[in-house]
């Protein structure tokens, strides 16, 4: 759990959580500080990419404003009602100013396909 950016409008947290149990715990900690959490999950490990944890992830996505990185086409279809693929347009929407501070929680064990850098560059 590493805060990599913090301002009046946004906080960005990078966490190595890449298993549903760890992701749930990290969300819980983040929400203790701020209820307005956007979750970005990178499906980087073999078990995540193979879909072994898809059902558990759907349960997590149902309860959070969620985005996925590195999902297969099949997973994107499965997650469609609960999480959207992270794109440049999604990032623009995510970073829009609002009346309250937003926490962006990035859970994964890879590099988020460069999206983390794009988010940070957009905030700085």
Question: Where do the protein language model's features map onto the residues?
Answer:
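ATP-dependent carboxylate-amine ligase
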Residues: 2-124
């Amino acid at each position: 759990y590493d805060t990599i950016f913090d301002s009046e409008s946004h906080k960005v947290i990078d966490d190595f959580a890449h298993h549903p149990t760890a992701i749930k715990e990290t969300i819980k900690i983040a929400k203790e500080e701020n209820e307005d959490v956007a979750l970005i999950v990178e499906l980087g490990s073999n078990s995540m990419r193979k879909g072994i944890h898809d059902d558990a992830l759907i349960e997590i996505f149902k309860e959070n404003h969620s985005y996925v990185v590195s999902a297969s086409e099949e997973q994107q279809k499965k997650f469609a009602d609960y999480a959207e693929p992270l794109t440049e347009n999604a990032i623009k929407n995510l970073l829009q100013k609002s009346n309250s501070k937003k926490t962006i929680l990035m859970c994964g064990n890879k590099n988020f396909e460069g999206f983390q850098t794009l988010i940070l560059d957009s905030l700085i």
